[in-house]
A protein has these predicted regions:
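A short acidic-Thr-Gly-centered motif at the start of a beta-strand
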Residues: 18, 22-23, 83-84, 138-155, ...
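Short helix-interrupting loop/turn segments at helix-coil junctions
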Residues: 30-35, 52, 64-70, 85-87, ...
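Inter-domain linker/hinge segments that demarcate the starts of reverse transcriptase
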Residues: 13-26, 53-61, 107-112, 135-148, ...
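Surface-exposed loop/turn segments and immediately adjacent short secondary-structure elements
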Residues: 1-89, 95, 103
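Mobile genetic element proteins and their domesticated derivatives, centered on retroelements
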Residues: 20, 24, 34, 54, ...
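Conserved catalytic palm subdomain of right-hand nucleotidyl-transferase polymerases, strongest
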Residues: 30-38, 87-96, 134-178
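Conserved pre-motif C helix in the palm subdomain of viral-like polymerases
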Residues: 89-120, 135-141, 162-165, 214-242
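Conserved polymerase palm-domain catalytic core
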Residues: 161-260, 267-276
Length: 283
């Protein structure tokens, strides 16, 4: 297993060749390519020469923050769902990004994850390794049974953020990462990627006009889940500030359980839920 260097806030640790090699080897096979039509298998088939070239390119981007234009572009395709295909709502969209960019994204993700894991609270499940929503549901059931057994009141409010990943405000995300002391250079590289990101719809063999997105995390990007988790953590931290909570099990106080982007807020009294979680339910 590759040991990823710990990049601190003041460290501009260069990208290792081993990081790039591990990223290339882990590229998915038999998946649709991005705008450059380069499949992952072709990148992997290049061997040492391609790995060396990517090592230089990735370090150049890491040092300057400047991404090659094709690496910032997403090709959007539509896939039909059930129902009347004359209606737009019966299609889902998939954003395809080029495989060469995924090499650097994998490297960045390996550097981002340790910092993100140490920032995110214990409550989230389904968005991090070793914490499944199945275990979270089991914990919720045990908690409810315990309160029923002791004839105590337990109030829940379930929050499902509509199009949560599409509503992340970029400026707030970068300020949150700085607040949580993420590596400055890592933030700079990711922020520049978002500043340059362009997308175009690919339909019936034709590609439409390119357009910018100024809100939301990138669909199909390896970093998106971690970035969303960081953003949501800031929201929850602010919402629960000065809120002690009254629900406890095993000596631990619980104010909420999270299932990916869904939240179960809980309290021993109904009015306790209104103050911390009420503002999040206002759309």
């Amino acid at each position: 297993m590759l040991t990823v260097p710990l990049v601190t806030d003041t460290d501009n640790y260069p990208i290792l060749r081993e990081e790039v090699e591990a990223a290339v080897k882990s590229l998915e096979k038999r998946k649709s390519p991005g705008i450059d039509n380069t499949p992952g298998e072709l990148v992997q088939a290049g061997g040492d020469a391609v790995i060396s070239a990517f090592h230089k390119i990735c370090n150049k981007i890491w040092q300057t923050g400047q991404w090659p234009i094709p690496w910032t572009q997403s090709r959007i395709i539509t896939l039909p769902k059930k129902g009347n295909l004359q209606q737009c709502k019966n299609y889902r969209t998939v954003s395809l990004i080029c495989y060469p960019s995924k090499v650097l994204l994998k490297v960045l993700l390996n550097r981002l994850k340790p910092q993100a894991e140490s920032t995110i609270a214990e409550e989230p499940a389904g968005v991090r390794s070793g914490r499944s929503t199945i275990e979270q549901i089991f914990s919720l059931r045990i908690l409810c049974e315990r309160y029923l057994q002791h004839q105590q009141e337990l109030y829940h409010v379930f929050i499902d953020f509509k199009k949560a990943f599409d509503r992340v405000w970029h400026k707030a995300l970068w300020s949150t990462m700085r607040l949580y002391n993420f590596n400055v250079n890592l933030i700079h590289v990711i922020e520049n990627l978002y500043n340059k990101t362009n997308s175009a719809v690919y339909l019936n063999g034709d590609i439409g006009d390119w357009f910018r997105t100024t809100v939301g995390v990138r669909q199909g990007c390896l970093l998106s889940q971690s970035l969303f988790n960081i953003f949501l953590e800031r929201i929850m931290t602010d919402a629960l500030e000065d809120h002690q909570g009254t629900v406890s099990i095993g000596g631990r106080t619980i104010t909420n359980l999270r299932f990916a982007d869904d939240i179960d807020g809980m309290a021993g009294k109904e009015e306790e839920l209104a103050k911390p979680l009420g503002p999040m339910m206002i759309s």
